[in-house]
């Protein structure tokens, strides 16, 4: 039995926030409907919600424009954050030394698809 499932995704790369912090927000919206996820993200107190909202809206726009799907019928099928390359900075220390500071980045991927027919 072959099922024709259309899945459309959007990716935000090199976001200046730790993947660990983004994952705790993505875990809350994975598997939910598009509208429900928007409401959840609007009222979460975390800084990671801003780039996730942007990627989610982009995925919905891609689904509407490229695949002809209806936004009201969308469900988040995949949502994950991969680690990106760290930004390396230096902190001056005493006696001419310098400590390296690694600022984390991540890549956020959100995929949406049509809700299964009941």
UniProtKB/Swiss-Prot annotation:
Top-level taxonomic group: Bacteria
GO cellular component: cytosolic large ribosomal subunit
Annotated signal sequence range: none
A molecular function (GO) term: rRNA binding
Keyword terms: Ribonucleoprotein, Ribosomal protein, RNA-binding, rRNA-binding
One of the protein's GO biological processes: translation
Pfam families assigned: Ribosomal_L22
Self-association state and partner proteins as the record states: Part of the 50S ribosomal subunit.
UniProt record similarity statement: Belongs to the universal ribosomal protein uL22 family.
PANTHER family tied to this protein: CHLOROPLAST 50S RIBOSOMAL PROTEIN L22-RELATED (PTHR13501), LARGE RIBOSOMAL SUBUNIT PROTEIN UL22M (PTHR13501:SF8)
Name of this protein: Large ribosomal subunit protein uL22
Originating organism: Nostoc punctiforme (strain ATCC 29133 / PCC 73102)
Gene coding for it: rplV
């Amino acid at each position: 039995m072959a099922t024709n499932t259309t899945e459309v995704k959007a990716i935000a790369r090199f976001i200046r926030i730790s993947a660990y912090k983004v994952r705790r927000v993505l875990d809350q919206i994975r598997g939910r409907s598009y509208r429900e996820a928007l409401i959840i993200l609007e009222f979460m107190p975390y800084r990671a919600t801003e780039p996730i909202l942007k990627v989610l809206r982009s995925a919905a726009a891609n689904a509407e424009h490229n695949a002809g799907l209806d936004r009201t019928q969308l469900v988040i099928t995949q949502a994950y954050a991969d680690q990106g390359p760290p930004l390396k900075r230096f902190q001056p220390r005493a006696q001419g030394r310098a400590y390296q500071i690694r600022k984390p980045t991540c890549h956020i991927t959100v995929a949406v698809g049509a809700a299964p027919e009941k």
